[in-house]
Swiss-Prot record:
GO BP: 'de novo' protein folding
Glycosylated sites: N51, N136
Mode of membrane association: Single-pass type I membrane protein
GO MF annotation: an example: unfolded protein binding
Highest taxon listed in the record's lineage: Eukaryota
Chain intervals for the UniProt region annotation (Disordered): 185-217
Keywords, sorted A to Z: Endoplasmic reticulum, Glycoprotein, Membrane, Signal, Transmembrane, Transmembrane helix
Keyword Endoplasmic reticulum applies: yes
PANTHER family: PROTEIN ROT1 (PTHR28090:SF1)
Subcellular localization: Endoplasmic reticulum membrane
Annotated signal peptide: 1-22
The protein's name in its UniProt record: Protein rot1
Taxonomy of the source species: Eukaryota, Fungi, Dikarya, Ascomycota, Pezizomycotina
Function noted in UniProt: Required for normal levels of the cell wall 1,6-beta-glucan. Involved in a protein folding machinery chaperoning proteins acting in various physiological processes including cell wall synthesis and lysis of autophagic bodies.
Amino acid sequence: MAPIVLPTVLIASAYLLSTVSAAPNVDELVGTWSTKSAAVLTGPGFYNPVNDSLLEPTHTGISYSFTADGYYEEAYYRAISNPAKPSCVSSIMQWQHGKFVLNDDGSLSLNPFSVDGRQLESAPCTADTATYTRYNQSETLQKYQVYTDPYTKLTRLDLYQFDGTPVNPMFLAYSPALMLPTETLNPTSSAKSTSSSKMKRWLGGADEPEEPTTSEGYLLPLNKNAKHISRGIEQPSLIHRIDLDLLWWAGVGMTIFGGAAYLL
């Protein structure tokens, strides 16, 4: 029986090592990943939190970013075809960020900051205006794979949706990740998602919805309560605080006074 002990120990050790090596490792996720065109990237080039706007990329695509301490950001830009009228292509842009958990089974749980997500829908053939709303959608990714793509020789990330459907492959674009600050950028007094609040931003057209405005008639942004924008919403500019008629007469008086002083 003695000769059997050593092979058994070796087999058990090999199994243990393979199990440890296969354990989920968040470090290999760290960075910014983008689909092949690399036109869509997370960060300030896709969402501008200062003026609360989504910036349209040159091509459609997907981008995800992950940090070692459990934060993520995602950016989607998709075209939606219309088989009945091919020229009427609509588009949708989505942006979210928040925290993620790498589970023991290798799945990923993505939990966004509920008030920060944004979505822009555009259907030029059916609506005169685009619809800009808050967006809040938690995600479960069944698994992921990071490896060197045999064709491009680039570091590749494959994500799989909750049902096993593969997401378009992404490639490492930045390491460390290109991301906006990993905190709530647009705090509100009541954190509700778009599905319940139905809040919209008017982007031009015939029927303007009723929305709160400043004293000068400008629409208040969705992120009006954010630290980086709330300070200046109701502050009038210098030109509104000066009486231009009074300034003109003061100039005339100074000219006359200067001329009289010169003649004396």
